[in-house]
Each structure stands twice: as C-alpha cells, then as structure tokens.
Amino acid sequence: MKRTFIMVLDSFGIGASADANKFGDEGADTLGHIAEACARGEADIGRSGPLTLPNLSRLGLGKAAEESTGKFPVGLDKNADIIGAYGYASELSSGKDTPSGHWEIAGVPVLFDWGYFSDVENSFPQELLDKLVKRANLPGYLGNCHSSGTVILDQLGEEHMKTGKPIFYTSADSVFQIACHEETFGLDRLYELCEIAREELTEGGYNIGRVIARPFIGDKPGNFQRTGNRHDLAVEPPAPTMLKKLVDEKGGEVVSIGKIADIYAHVGITQKVKATGLDALFDATIEEMKKAGDNTIVFTNFVDFDSSYGHRRDVAGYAAALELFDRRLPELMALVKEDDILLLTADHGCDPTWPGTDHTREHIPVLVYGPKVKPGSLGHRETFADIGQTVAKYFDLSPMDYGKNML
C-alpha cells in the first residue's frame, strides 16, 4: 500500500538562498535566528530557554540547516540519532510566495512573473476599484494600500463597521486582500465580493496570484481578530502537479488539510478538511492518516507559523509553535506504515527577526521518513520540484518536467 504524508511548515526557512540578495533577504535565516534569539533568552514569552526540537532533530533538521548555512542551529541536538533522510532545497520559482512554493513542491515551478501592486499608497488601479464598487454594489472602499493584516484592522475596522465599506489591501506578494467583519458585513457577502474580484483581476490581465478573504470579528481596535474562515482564490497551476497526476493516472486520493486546496485552486484535490490552529490541524492530519488507503496523499499546511508568527515578527510565538509541532510529531510518525513516506518541508521563509513583515527568500528543509527510507544526507536540492518528482516516482506516475528523484 502506497501512501505519502506531506507536512508543510509554512514559512519555515533554513537559511538565505544564493539569490536572496535580489529580494533584499541576504542573511535571512528563519530557523537560525529563532534559535539564536532563544539561546540569548530573548524568546521567553510563553516558553523559555534554548529552542528544543528533539524529534525534528532526529529527522535531520539540524544537519539540513548546517548544510544550508554552514552553521548548526544553536540549542538543537548535534548528537541526535538520525532516523530520516534530510537535505535542503533552493527555489527555482521567480517569487517567494505561497503558491509559487507549493506549486514547485508539487513539481510545477512558477517561471513567469506574477503581477504585483507595488505602490504603497493608492495601490490599486482606479478602473479596477470602480468595477468592484459597481458590480458588488458597494458604498465605497477603505484601505487601497500596503499593510499588515492585523494593523489595518486596528486602523480601519471601526470605520468599516460603521460604513459597510470593505477594506482592500495588498503586500509585497501577488495578492488582493479583502477584510470584512463577519457579522456586520457577512461572510457569504465577503466570499461573493472575492469571487467578483477574482473575475475582474483575471479578465483585466493583472496576473495576480491570489484574492484572499480576511474575515474578522470584534468591536473596537485592540480586540479585532481574524477568524479561521479565510478563503484564498488562486489561479490554477500552469501544468499538472503530481497531485493531479495521482488522481488522473491512478484514481488516487489527495486529502487537503488547511489551506492546501485553495492554494492549488482545488485542482488535483479529492477531499478537503478544514481546521484552524496547529493542534486542530494536527488532529485532522492524524484522523486522515488513520483512514488513508492505497494511492493516497494527505497534504497539510501548517499556516500559523507564517500568518501568526512570521509576518507578525513574533519570535517567541514562532519558537513555541515549533516546539508544539515537535512534541506532537511522534503521533504522526507512529502512523507511518512499512511502505509509507512522511515528508516535512516548507514553502518559503518568513524570518521573524527580519525588517518589515514580508516573506524571506530562503532554502527549505526536506525531511523524509519511512521504514524503507535510508537515513542520511540528501544534500542540496536545486529545486523544490525534487519533492514532486520523488512523489511521482514513488506512485509510479508519469515523470514531472522538473526535479530529480531523491530516493
């Protein structure tokens, strides 16, 4: 029975890539800098002391990071008994965003340039805004700028509730984000507005990767809170991913947990499981692993590393989340049967010690575990697509156009 379990620790980079200078990210190191801050006692909120990741260390995380940066992460166990194959991968794709990273993991790098709204103020073309107001029958809009999603709620959330005007904002990523109050504006209405925005962006040729619905609750600055009802409207990958090939060629199952289905525009996904928060994502993953039959991929995105800690530059929160993940990792490993493969990786970096609030261009860890996987170094992988090619080979699918089999 062939089953693969892919866990994406969203934004968990392990050192700047060779082209990081093109992105302003030379020297970024999500894992390394978190570990250093912990060792200095600068991440003692809700946790304390050096970063402790014994189970990830046994899978080779520390050694992969050392291969990536030349430095072993402070606090991790140098003498851990390695039970998995480990390496690090560079990104071929032109961006450091979520879709690019995930599509490349699935064997389809993004070699074209996304469109971006690069103006910090008045970010969106007036023509686009006018169409959205008209088609969605809006009283107007707020924002129209670059912003952190939490900051803009404190700035404009109250006005949004009073006026019914949605909050439009973007970032350094190829995104059009819409924040609306779940109760005063309504969730269904927000989703409808996002569908209209997706259509207008596509028809207008803007080449924007994602429209993101950002629902929130609360009644005043300081207690506004984004909910788990986020919804991403992505464009479809430009070629068949290994997910789609498994479904098409083998009649296989691909179970999405978290935001995976949205990232791939639901192409190559046969089942979607919703869960919010690290523990809930873990619980859902365990349930689906127990149920998984032959020719199945269970694919989970642990978004909180990125959305709650990376972008918010919360070092202690990121460290605590990693330690929680590590504590629960044996629950996943215990469900790995003789022919199974468990793959742990990331989609980009988001160094919480780095200036700004955006992603960082970094290598990602590639940690592979299974009874038939030979422990040891996989070395430097030149593209995330090596993961997709490896999975395609494992399931006896037609080869991907990019990537090399690692096993």
From Swiss-Prot:
Co-factor binding details: Binds 2 manganese ions.
Pathways per UniProt: Carbohydrate degradation; 2-deoxy-D-ribose 1-phosphate degradation; D-glyceraldehyde 3-phosphate and acetaldehyde from 2-deoxy-alpha-D-ribose 1-phosphate: step 1/2
Any one biological process term the GO annotation gives: 2-deoxyribose 1-phosphate catabolic process
Gene3D superfamilies tied to this protein: Alkaline Phosphatase, subunit A (3.40.720.10), Phosphopentomutase (3.30.70.1250)
Binding site for Mn(2+) 1: 10, 347-348
Cofactor(s) listed: Mn(2+)
Top class in the EC scheme: isomerase
GO cellular component, one term: cytosol
Catalyses which reaction(s): 2-deoxy-alpha-D-ribose 1-phosphate = 2-deoxy-D-ribose 5-phosphate; alpha-D-ribose 1-phosphate = D-ribose 5-phosphate
A GO MF term: phosphopentomutase activity
Annotated localization: Cytoplasm
Keywords: Cytoplasm, Isomerase, Manganese, Metal-binding
Functional description taken from the UniProt entry: Isomerase that catalyzes the conversion of deoxy-ribose 1-phosphate (dRib-1-P) and ribose 1-phosphate (Rib-1-P) to deoxy-ribose 5-phosphate (dRib-5-P) and ribose 5-phosphate (Rib-5-P), respectively.
Protein's name in the database: Phosphopentomutase
Record organism: Yersinia enterocolitica serotype O:8 / biotype 1B (strain NCTC 13174 / 8081)
Encoding gene, per UniProt annotation: deoB
